[in-house]
Amino acid sequence: TNLNCLGNVLTALDVSNSPSLEFLDCYGNNLTSLDVSNNTALTYLAVGYNQLDSLDVSSNTALTTLRCHFNQLTSLDVSANTSLTILDCYNNSLTSLDVSANTALTTLICHHNSLTSLDVSSNTALARLECNHNSLTSLDVSTNTALIWLSCFSNQLTSLDVSANTALRWLHCRYNQLTSLDVSTNTSLTYLNCEANQLTSLDVSSNTALGQLDCGNNQLTSLDVSSNTPLYQLVCGNNQLASLDVSSNTALTLLYCQTNQLTSLDVSNNTALSNLRCSNNQLTSLDVSSNTALTQLRFYSNQITEIDLSSNTAIGNLECGSNQLTSLDVSSNTALTSLACQNNQLTYLNMKNGLTEQVTDFNATNNSLTCIEILDPAWATSN
């Protein structure tokens, strides 16, 4: 027997006379309590997005799926639910969670709670674990060799050992206090986000399947991505990189390498690039003539004296302020909607692209402009 009453405005629901009920979905109502003690046949229970402050599932020993996220639960006892394979209890106020009896669990999503510890050593079938946005100081996943997806970001982890998790494809551990991270055995990784930790080095040479890498806001002095040829997103800003070689990463569409110590940047092989941010470095030149797919280009706060944008007709957002440009020609950039070229040495600015009225964000202050060429004098007067 199934009952689906999701997305209503129910404040009460009585299912006490339905002992044969197997499927109950009352997601997205205004329930403050729910009694399922008589529903011993339940295998699926979804009570997410209600206002429950307690939930007793001790009688529901047949449960395989329990979704109780976005409530006000302060505790949850699932010790009797040994058949559970999926448990979603995220966005509650749980301070502890005991899943030691739930050895069949394949998915555990408990993020956005107040957990200070989490023991998943008994959950050897676990393929997906999301425990981010808690207060965890440690996490042992050494027995979880089936893990494919691990999100443990925004905790207080000082170390993370994923050497046993060779099936891992997705690892998100940003906003912790990690000083090292060894991913050499995780050769199936396609996504790695270790941003905002305290990493001084990162070896991704074994991760040849990586498509997305975010290692920004660390203390990296070098980064070798030559083995990561499928990479299409690389975020490595706010580190201490003195050089960056992306010549092998021809699939790159997004590259954020701002706020480093780069003196040069060669993106001539990265013809698929649509978004490039390399601001706050020490670049004296930048060649983007091969990057015809660029829609966003930010290279402010460098030492660039000239830039040729004639090939970049798709650029919509251009930020080139605080350089040493003496002239700027955006006449070919007919998609331009935002231009920030302040704090340069501009004496000449060519905006004769025929579409000046579409530029909604324009800043050319603190220059020495004597001429701005446009096709629409009325626009110049009003802007």
Predicted segments with their positions:
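Short linear segments in intrinsically disordered or otherwise low-structure-confidence regions
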Residues: 57, 75, 96-99, 120, ...
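Intrinsically disordered, low-complexity repeat tracts
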Residues: 1, 5, 11, 32-33, ...
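Consensus "Asn ladder" position of solenoid repeat domains
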Residues: 8, 29, 50, 71, ...
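Leucine-rich repeat
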Residues: 17-21, 38-42, 59-63, 80-84, ...
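Leucine-rich solenoid repeat scaffolds
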Residues: 347-383
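Conserved hydrophobic beta-strand positions in leucine-rich repeat
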Residues: 1-3, 22-26, 43-47, 64-68, ...
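Low-complexity tandem-repeat tracts in intrinsically disordered regions
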Residues: 22, 53, 64, 72, ...
